[in-house]
């Protein structure tokens, strides 16, 4: 299973980017056209994209066959085996 890369996040709310001169000119121009400052322009346009990427990475897609199999197991769970029973009885009693 792939692990997600860990990104160090500083405690401040600043984000520094290096872009080409042409890219910066285009971004500044687009922000001006929308009559917004550079920060608001970048944040308002990147947040939906970032959310879409995170949602896609964290969502599980199942085939119809997989869905039916899971529903069948939930509706008719198998009997617990010896290892599961032993593990359950080894747990501390949480009743108080």
UniProtKB/Swiss-Prot annotation:
Going by the UniProt record, its keywords in alphabetical order are:
DNA-binding, Repressor, Toxin-antitoxin system, Transcription, Transcription regulation
Per its record, what are the GO molecular function terms?
DNA binding
Q: Name one GO biological process term.
A: regulation of DNA-templated transcription
Annotated region (Neutralization domain) at 61-96
Q: Looking at the record's lineage, which domain of life comes first?
A: Bacteria
Q: What do we know about what induces or represses this protein's expression?
A: TacA3-TacT3 autorepresses its transcription at low TacT3 concentrations, at higher TacT3 levels it derepresses transcription. The tacA3-tacT3 operon is up-regulated 5-fold in a relA-spoT-dependent manner within 30 minutes of phagocytosis by mouse bone marrow-derived macrophages.
Q: How does it associate, per the subunit comment?
A: Forms a complex with cognate toxin TacT3. Forms a 4:2 antitoxin:toxin complex with cognate toxin TacT3. Forms a 4:4 antitoxin:toxin complex with promoter DNA, where 2 TacT3 dimers bridge 2 TacA3 dimers. Only TacA3 contacts promoter DNA.
Task: Tell what the record comments on domains.
Answer: The neutralization domain (ND) is sufficient to counteract the toxic effect of its cognate toxin, although other regions also play a role.
Regarding protein family, the annotation reads: Belongs to the TacA antitoxin family.
Report the protein's function: Antitoxin component of a type II toxin-antitoxin (TA) system. Counteracts the toxic effect of cognate toxin TacT3, but not TacT1 or TacT2. Plays a role in persister cell formation. The TacA3-TacT3 complex both represses and derepresses expression of its own operon. The hexameric 4:2 TacA3-TacT3 complex binds promoter DNA and represses its transcription; both subunits are required. The octomeric 4:4 TacA3-TacT3 complex derepresses the operon. The shift from hexameric to octomeric complex probably alters DNA-binding, leading to dissociation from the operator DNA and derepression. Does not bind the promoter of the TacA1-TacT1 operon.
Protein name (record) = Antitoxin TacA3
């Amino acid at each position: 299973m792939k692990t997600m890369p860990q990104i160090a996040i500083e405690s401040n709310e600043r984000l520094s980017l290096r872009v080409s001169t042409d890219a910066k000119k285009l971004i500044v121009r687009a922000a001006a056209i929308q009559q917004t400052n550079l920060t608001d322009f970048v944040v308002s346009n990147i947040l939906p994209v970032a959310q879409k990427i995170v949602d896609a990475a964290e969502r599980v897609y199942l085939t119809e066959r997989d869905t039916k199999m899971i529903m069948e197991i939930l509706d008719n769970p198998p009997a617990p085996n010896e290892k599961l029973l032993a593990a359950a009885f080894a747990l501390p009693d949480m009743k108080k």
